[in-house]
């Protein structure tokens, strides 16, 4: 595990890294690290953090569900969520006023699931965390930039291996040595149930090497001929869309004209998924007659 962390850190530029089973596990472990600060007596008590500084301050617009509520991962690590601001707007003074003696960490979520306007910046979070001598955790699960979040000054940055990097099921926490050491201490507590297998460690490092060399990047230009071919089918109109959070991830967006095609978007998506070669689409906008194809998956 230590050696894998060293290899991962070569790609992130961080002082150290800790590998785990997935990004959700990484959030729980990072929260537990912030609360226990690596103290073994406290580690064995997690997720029971009664009597400890256990509050995790985050923006209300960042309180998302990625298949499970992010609050579930926070609670698994012993954290108690403190929301800041309203769903669509937050101010720095609100973040600062939420910090008390019970605060364990700040959490910043970078995700297409989050509200994208009216939120505080990562710079605001870094500055407030440093003033109050608190660790800053960044959930960058699906982010493709391995360097920016570490370079921002965050203490623990959580990534998924399987999302942007096309690794086997895996995740990792990368950041400052003090806090990664506290994450590693959780192996004798909650992280024991979240450990990663040796095969997936190898797969993660291999995937990061490929990603570093640019072998997994699919450009908008490469997708355009595919979109054009799809648009030639009567009742389908395809174009290229960029990821909602502004990442350099491009997908084919397909609009279904149910009257012309003879079936609606739900039926098209089901046929793709249930075919001899299963094709899984992004289904978030099926109710609008739209779905997307992500070439990475």
Regions inferred by a protein language model and the residue ranges of each:
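Intrinsically disordered, low-complexity segments enriched in polar/charged residues with Gly/Pro
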Residues: 4-6, 158-160, 269-270
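N-terminal glycine-rich anion-binding loops that anchor highly charged ligand groups
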Residues: 1-7, 101, 246, 282-283
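Conserved PLP-enzyme active-site core in the AAT-like
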Residues: 1, 11-212, 227-234, 239, ...
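N-terminal, charge-rich interaction modules
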Residues: 4, 217-230
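Glycine-rich phosphate/diphosphate-binding loops and the adjacent beta-loop-alpha structural elements
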Residues: 209-214, 294-296
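Conserved C-terminal alpha-helix-loop-beta "cap" of PLP-dependent enzymes
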Residues: 231-297
């Amino acid at each position: 595990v230590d050696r894998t962390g060293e290899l991962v850190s070569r790609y992130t530029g961080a002082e150290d890294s800790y590998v785990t089973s997935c990004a959700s596990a990484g959030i729980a472990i990072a929260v537990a690290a912030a609360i226990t600060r690596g103290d073994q007596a406290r580690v064995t008590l997690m997720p029971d953090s009664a009597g400890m500084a256990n509050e995790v301050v985050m923006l209300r617009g960042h309180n998302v569900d990625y298949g499970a509520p992010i609050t579930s991962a926070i609670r698994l690590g012993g954290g108690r969520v403190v929301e800041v601001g309203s769903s669509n707007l937050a101010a720095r003074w609100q973040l600062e006023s939420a910090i008390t003696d019970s605060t364990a960490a700040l959490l910043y979520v970078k995700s297409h699931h989050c509200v994208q306007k009216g939120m505080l910046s990562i710079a605001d979070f870094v500055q407030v965390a440093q003033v109050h001598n608190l660790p800053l955790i960044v959930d960058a699960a699906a982010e493709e930039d391995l360097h920016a979040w570490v370079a921002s000054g965050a203490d623990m940055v959580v990534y998924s291996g399987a999302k942007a990097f096309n690794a086997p099921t895996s995740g990792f926490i990368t950041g400052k040595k003090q806090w990664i050491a506290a994450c590693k201490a959780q192996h004798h507590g909650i992280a024991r149930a979240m450990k990663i297998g040796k095969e997936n460690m190898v797969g993660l490092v291999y995937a990061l090497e490929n990603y570093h060399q640019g072998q997994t990047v699919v450009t908008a230009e490469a997708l355009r001929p595919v979109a054009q071919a799809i648009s030639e089918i009567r009742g389908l109109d395809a174009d290229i869309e960029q990821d909602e959070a502004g990442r350099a991830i491009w997908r084919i967006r397909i609009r279904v004209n149910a009257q012309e095609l003879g079936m609606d978007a739900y039926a098209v998506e089901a046929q793709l998924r249930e075919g001899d070669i299963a094709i899984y689409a992004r289904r978030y906008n099926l109710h609008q007659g739209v779905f997307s194809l992500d070439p990475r998956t």
